[in-house]
Amino acid sequence: MDLVTRRIRGALGIAGPLLFLEGVPRARLGEVVRIRGEPEASGRAAEERSGQVIALSRDRIAVQVLEETRGLAPARSEVTLTGQVARLGVARGMLGRVLDGLGRPADGLPPPVPEARPAIHGAALNVTRREKPSDFIETGVSAIDGMNTLVRGQKLPVFSCAGLPASRLAAQIVCQARVRGGEPFAVVFAAMGSPFREYHAFLEAFRAAGVLDRTVVFLNRAEDPPIERLMTPRCALTCAEHLAFTHGLHVLVVLTDVTSYCEALREVALAREEVPGRRGYPGYMYTDLATIFERAGRVRGRPGSLTQLPVLTMPDDDLTHPIPDLTGYITEGQIVLSRDLDRRGVYPPIDVLPSLSRLMGLGAGPGKTRDDHRPVADQLYAFYARGRDVRRMAAIVGAANLGEEEKRLLAFADAFEDGLVGQGGTFRTIEDTLEAGWRLLSGFPPAALTRIPERLLRARPAQPAAAATSGGAIA
């Protein structure tokens, strides 16, 4: 046994993705392990796998194997502890590449020549070095850009129900997202637990839109081991940090689906026989998610930014489920998809009332988008909330029994959903979104627009009221 690597012949046993060893001196948590095993079937060549030390006790250790353990014979395995932590070779040349969940080429091309090999378990940004998030990222989606603006350095999750087009929305944002002013921009996309149909659709969408050259894609498939799923977002963020803070790019990281990640975390925790917490998830899931989300931000004195848009599916459509509940505590808002809007054929089915971007004020307004951005958004919110209340009342008393003001609000709510929110797969600039909002508001007298300063109302040309109350789509 040398000073750099330690080799052990034979293991105690295997339980799922875990390999147990005893008599291993100086093992460290997170240490990379190489496993050379002989399958049970005779006559086959030995296979080599990799793993990571995840638990230590006085006389034994547990290793998470990154590949399939089926057919691995513990007694005939040779385990090498390398003394190294998991690292990823990163480079600007990763742009345009499709990688697996561990950062290995999945597009048939050779690995990129690394410029550095940082550890994938990076720390959150130092709070004393953080720069306040500012300036917005244009996604081309009106319900986000206009009503819940995404700011550079922010972490803004998308909460979806099972069966809603969250993956389609994620792909659309990857294809459409940009920053204003010609600054360098890139997207890092990480899919976790994706079935073949889904990840194939992602790649086809990126290629068709011509955005693959400024995108790095990490694909963890549904059939891949759960431990790989736990490393995929960390590999993606390690790559994004290099692009953002070494090369000065503004990087948007899209992670989907965080629920698959949490399910893998629970599966591995149960295999380690840990005491489960709420609904079987480990008690440290909050801390684990924080190690992912808190890597977003900006660094004082350095160009570039790292923005996160994680997508998660709420089990049983439950906002209080541990996954969305804990995610909401860590992140800075949420974009909520609605099953009711989806049933009505509205795409993207974003419900703007429970949605929120807590940092919108840092990326919207004078010098960032337009002077009228916040006032128009606030007025649209106010009328839409009242229109939703009227809709519930109309379901009881009937629309024919509503007053003129209530009918106007009801028509506004329909037009808002069908036109402003339900834009389909088209791209809208922030100017297009705000002009669409003004057309909706033109159906109300100026005295009713209490959220908009008078100077902005005087600066607007007169518009026909029919566009706001017709209930149809907005051009």
UniProtKB/Swiss-Prot annotation:
<dbReference type="InterPro" id="IPR020003">
    <property type="entry name" value="ATPase_a/bsu_AS"/>
</dbReference>
<keyword id="KW-0813">Transport</keyword>
<dbReference type="InterPro" id="IPR004100">
    <property type="entry name" value="ATPase_F1/V1/A1_a/bsu_N"/>
</dbReference>
<dbReference type="Pfam" id="PF02874">
    <property type="entry name" value="ATP-synt_ab_N"/>
</dbReference>
<dbReference type="GO" id="GO:0046933">
    <property type="term" value="F:proton-transporting ATP synthase activity, rotational mechanism"/>
</dbReference>
<dbReference type="InterPro" id="IPR055190">
    <property type="entry name" value="ATP-synt_VA_C"/>
</dbReference>
<protein>
    <recommendedName>
        <fullName>V-type ATP synthase beta chain</fullName>
    </recommendedName>
</protein>
<comment type="function">
    <text>Produces ATP from ADP in the presence of a proton gradient across the membrane. The V-type beta chain is a regulatory subunit.</text>
</comment>
<dbReference type="GO" id="GO:0042777">
    <property type="term" value="P:proton motive force-driven plasma membrane ATP synthesis"/>
</dbReference>
<dbReference type="InterPro" id="IPR000194">
    <property type="entry name" value="ATPase_F1/V1/A1_a/bsu_nucl-bd"/>
</dbReference>
<dbReference type="GO" id="GO:0005524">
    <property type="term" value="F:ATP binding"/>
</dbReference>
<dbReference type="Pfam" id="PF00006">
    <property type="entry name" value="ATP-synt_ab"/>
</dbReference>
<keyword id="KW-0066">ATP synthesis</keyword>
<keyword id="KW-0406">Ion transport</keyword>
<comment type="similarity">
    <text>Belongs to the ATPase alpha/beta chains family.</text>
</comment>
<dbReference type="Pfam" id="PF22919">
    <property type="entry name" value="ATP-synt_VA_C"/>
</dbReference>
<dbReference type="InterPro" id="IPR022879">
    <property type="entry name" value="V-ATPase_su_B/beta"/>
</dbReference>
<dbReference type="InterPro" id="IPR027417">
    <property type="entry name" value="P-loop_NTPase"/>
</dbReference>
<keyword id="KW-0375">Hydrogen ion transport</keyword>
